[in-house]
């Protein structure tokens, strides 16, 4: 399903989906509000394709949230899923969705994008943590 979106804008689309997941989890903003993307203040605005791919990622993650959370939780070593910081949790959820349900996207691409987002938005250790958990998921997916 994701092949209908050009690959060039996918990084931007993943960041938008990550931000929507974070806002949904941290502030309880409804998916309906978030998928309208009226909260964006970007110039230039994202393309229609970027917004479409972001919606696909965000809503797909929410649709499979129970399975995704179980998968991520089972791959954590010395961590409790409910105690993860919300940035790392949003990145892991989004990327686990892609690893589990978007088989046309190579795992190395998913992990690379997640690590990049973790470097930009997470703590100093987030990118290593995200890389390790997602690598573990990719090996068993």
Curated annotation (Swiss-Prot):
Gene Ontology CC terms: cytosol
Listed GO MF terms: RNA binding
UniProt superkingdom: Bacteria
Annotated keywords: RNA-binding, Transcription, Transcription antitermination, Transcription regulation
GO biological process entries: DNA-templated transcription termination; transcription antitermination
Xref: InterPro entries: NusB-like_sf, NusB_fam, NusB_RsmB_TIM44
Similarity-based family: Belongs to the NusB family.
HAMAP family: NusB
Protein's job: Involved in transcription antitermination. Required for transcription of ribosomal RNA (rRNA) genes. Binds specifically to the boxA antiterminator sequence of the ribosomal RNA (rrn) operons.
Protein name listed in UniProt: Transcription antitermination protein NusB
């Amino acid at each position: 399903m994701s092949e209908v979106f050009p690959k060039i804008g996918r990084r931007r689309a993943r960041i938008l989906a990550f931000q929507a997941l974070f806002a949904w989890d941290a502030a309880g903003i409804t998916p309906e509000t978030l998928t309208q993307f009226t909260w964006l203040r970007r110039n230039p605005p994202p393309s229609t394709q970027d917004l479409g791919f972001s919606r696909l990622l965000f809503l797909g993650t929410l649709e499979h949230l129970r399975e995704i959370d179980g998968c991520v939780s089972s791959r954590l070593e010395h961590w409790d899923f409910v105690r993860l910081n919300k940035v790392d949790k949003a990145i892991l959820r989004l990327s686990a969705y892609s690893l589990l349900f978007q088989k046309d996207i190579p795992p190395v691409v998913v992990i690379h994008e997640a690590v990049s987002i973790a470097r930009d938005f997470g703590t100093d250790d987030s990118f290593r943590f995200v890389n390790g958990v997602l690598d573990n998921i990719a090996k068993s997916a």
